[in-house]
């Protein structure tokens, strides 16, 4: 133990938090989570240990602007101004200091290893009692599972130690400091330390004791570490559980270790041995270690599909069987290896359906509770994810246990990111920073290596490629050859990675950046001498209304075996709850706390909102990642299973044939598909209706029984095929009524019964409609070529940093948002049975014509208005966001009914999960409440729309809500939106894709851009 004076003044003078060579003082060695059971049955059943005591709860708390402001008296007693906070928590979530959101830029002046003198510091204290039996014998430890960013610890006024690395435990021996009766802990936490330079992750920068604190009592002679691994024969019919156990304390000949393996109540294998390991070199072996090997016949293998778990109990006892203590862990028999360019699990090539996950809670910041962790896992499993990357740091210890038990593959990532350094590898190539990096990697491995869910180690994120990475790669490969190592920095394919793991590489498009090119994922595989698998560590940036083009990735993954999937960025929006002056909650992002620097809404990239409500994009991910694929040939459906290990045993295939959403025939077939197998399903003779309409066959895979992660009736996969469309000439109902045209200087007015249409001759637009004496429009029906910018449209543009290549800047520069309509033509003609209005407009900005729109409106005796639109786009203007019409309807109806793709929001490059049917939803559900308002709620492939008294027919896309595109464009947060009068309707003949390969460069694929130059569409507007 390092002995240092207890004085606060000495600690402050020494400034351990500005010395990269000091990462800890008196911290105990890393190991898997311990409980020190004194009963092996309790260890086997994972019951709460009497030797493990939580210190979570209310602590005394005082905040200071700098460590030098902390009074020395605090070491002995609480300060008069001390408040109370709950531990674990981030102090910023309790109103002390401000959270800072920044992506790349360091929130402090970059001068490593030094940090600002204004370094917010919080002083925590807790008074507690210790069992007298703990004081009489053994060792009492205190465990801090996570403290950000560095801290000093005192007990009863005496200095205990120092720790940093906010995402791994710091554990100290308190035995020499405790006394009978009351004891007092004092913890001084600093916001910034030299460790902050290694923690430049894209997340909120928060501080405090934000993970659990506990006391653990272990015997004097104790298990100090244990490591389990599984080995197999070629066909996995026989396995060996290898358990290496290490002890500390007084080594005696009578000490024994027993390792027993359990499957539920059944003991599968057991072995006992004294300490004394195998001969290592000419000086002998480890006297304090022993390795036991247990043979297991026909083990039930672990995978994310079937997470079979055993329980290993490690007992330290005397030769006569007297138990000293027991530790235990779950064991999954599984093998991970790379062979022939493929990442294999239990001999089968994996397809990673992955997502990156930050630890984030909208109310609690970076404090994770079991309920939230389980909620995340259930949602991931329900949406066909099988893998998660701990971005970008080791997670709460419970997370790994839950992933073991529910079944998720985990990339465990070291808490290292130096994204804001120039160059990025300035620290990671510096040997002075090797000790700090080494602790972050080695301690992660030592804590988490017993978890079967951890299949890949990661050296960190966005830190360039330095010599320190190479050294740590070699250390991991030496200590744990059972797992691959990945690392993206320095180009994604350096010597420090077993897997090509790029971020945001595109399917077919090269991004030839200097020094670190991002080749298309297809090209990367074919580079000379490259034999590694490719798994995208980040892709499909799900910021706001995004995930366009996701299907292209999955087509490539299924086409090329060495493209083994990737991890979507990312799981959850990192918005935080604030309250307005009336106490109403609202969602905040970067800058909303007065934090500078900040990266605005870039913290919200999730497939789910911060409260875990899904984004519409999550359904697209679920569909593309589904484990059943379908092919229709004639009346035969071929069902292919992409499960590697699971035989379908809880699936029914429901099929239905519908004409324009009206069911004509349906059936149900049990699925009986072997892993990677096929099943052919013969359908009966399908109906061939004579009436006009679209005929669709829909199949859905339903789980009739509940599972550990889903309720009964869960739909896991689906597919649709359009069978036919019977055409017919729609004749208007026989009517002797003829619309009457009245012409005035200002207007053309058409009347038919109780309906009237008014066209303004000065503007050329349909300016009003009446049904009886009720006006139907609040604004004219006008052309629309713009949208409220998406995050993907904005890219990195902001007021102080304009990116001229961003879509929104191109549209602004070209005048799309400012364009005015110049009337070229507005005429009216009376036909034999209808009135025809013909208009033409030139949409201009600063004298330049951007679009020419020609329209005809044919109003017939049935009251239908058939609208035909032809648009020409100037060849030298940017491709528009949309080509459509919009108006503000006077009505506010409760529900929206449509025949088309749904039910969720969908866009041209994100619609494979949508199904053609007749849908009916509340008006409020047609709006997607993205925290940063933008274009939203589109439904594509629409043949009919019904709202209030109105009906529209054709082939179009629409969105409908209480918010105008203008308001969405001008409003910074969703809670600031106000419902406008009436309802805004946007009907598009064509709409540009939304993109999503990344969110900082134009990423809409060419086939989803509006580049044709000429466009034609039609629709019919009538009243029901």
Curated annotation (Swiss-Prot):
Residues reported to bind Na(+) = 202, 602, 605
> Do you know which SMART domains this protein is assigned to?
Bgal_small_N
Q: Where does Mg(2+) 2 bind?
A: 598
The record's comment on cofactor binding reads: Binds 2 magnesium ions per monomer.
Catalysis performed (reactions)? Hydrolysis of terminal non-reducing beta-D-galactose residues in beta-D-galactosides
Say if the entry is tagged with keyword Membrane.
no
* Catalytic residues in the record: 462 (proton donor), 538 (nucleophile)
> What EC number(s) does this enzyme carry?
3.2.1.23
Question: EC class of this enzyme?
Answer: hydrolase
- Cellular compartments per GO CC: beta-galactosidase complex
Q: Where, by residue number, does Mg(2+) 1 bind?
A: 417, 419, 462
- The answer on whether this UniProt entry bears the keyword Hydrolase reads yes
**GO terms (BP aspect):** lactose catabolic process
Q: Where does substrate bind?
A: 103, 202, 462, 538-541, 605, 1000
Which GO MF terms does the UniProt record name?
beta-galactosidase activity; carbohydrate binding; magnesium ion binding
- Residues the UniProt record annotates as site (Transition state stabilizer): 358, 392
Keywords (A to Z) from UniProt: Glycosidase, Hydrolase, Magnesium, Metal-binding, Sodium
Cofactors required = Mg(2+); Na(+)
Q: Which family does it belong to?
A: Belongs to the glycosyl hydrolase 2 family.
Record text on subunit structure and interactions: Homotetramer.
| Entry-linked NCBIfam families | PRK09525.1 (NF007074)
Q: Specify the protein name.
A: Beta-galactosidase
- State the organism named in the record: Escherichia coli (strain ATCC 8739 / DSM 1576 / NBRC 3972 / NCIMB 8545 / WDCM 00012 / Crooks)
